[in-house]
Each structure stands twice: as structure tokens, then as C-alpha cells.
Design a protein with these regions (language model features):
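Secreted/periplasmic proteins
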Residues: 1-116
């Protein structure tokens, strides 16, 4: 399967399966060149711009987190996003390993308004 990353900031919303990656990749370099920190609120997405921010909402619980996209993946056909350990923990996905989520890109300016 081929993915073509978005080259501009545009609205994006999708529902699909999230997974998480943790200890095995902790300390490894991400696609952005940053070092992966399983305790940071980050995620890997196949097409969202690096860097960008997304709100990820677990459809079952309604819990939401905001993550910074700093890596590419997941490269498993049925997966939409790979969350850091801590993001998955906050969404309640650690024990099951995966779960259905909605991913919405946060456009520039919106994040600023949230944290004023």
C-alpha cells in the first residue's frame, strides 16, 4: 500500500483503528528526526503533515487527547494511527492494544485559541 503525505494544512477527519508503540521504539529516531519518547503526547500517521497536531477520540469511551504527529506509520493495513504509550494509556487502549478512534487534524490557530 502506498501513502502520499499531505503537503498542506487542510481539514482532515477519519475513523479507524488506533494502535500504540512503546518500549521497543523508545529512544529510536522518528521520521521527523526526533527521538521517540513513549511518555510524550505524540503519534505516527501515514499522511498528516509532520509536524501537525490532531485530536484523537476513543469512540467507545469518548476520551480525547491531543497529539503531535512526528512520525510515519502505522504500516498495518487496518490501522489509522499509532499512538505513543502515554496517549494510548490516556485513551484506555493499553490493555486491548487497539481501539476505534476518530482522528481530526487541528489547523494552525485553533490550538492557540485553546491554550490562551
Amino acid at each position: 500500500r502506498r501513502y502520499e503525505p499531505m503537503t498542506s494544512r487542510a481539514p482532515y477527519r477519519a475513523v479507524g483503528i488506533a494502535s500504540w508503540y512503546g518500549r521497543r521504539y523508545h529512544g529510536q529516531k522518528t521520521a521527523s528526526g526526533e527521538i521517540y519518547d513513549m511518555y510524550a503526547m505524540t503519534a505516527a500517521h501515514p499522511i498528516l503533515p509532520i509536524p501537525s497536531y490532531a485530536r484523537v477520540t476513543a469512540t467507545r469511551s469518548g476520551r480525547s487527547v491531543v497529539v503531535r504527529i512526528n512520525d510515519r506509520g502505522p504500516f498495518v493495513n487496518d490501522r489509522l494511527i499509532d499512538l505513543s504509550y502515554v496517549a494510548a494509556y490516556r485513551l484506555g487502549l493499553i490493555e486491548t492494544g487497539t481501539g476505534e478512534v476518530q482522528v481530526e487534524v487541528i489547523l494552525p490557530g485553533v490550538l492557540d485559541r485553546w491554550f490562551r
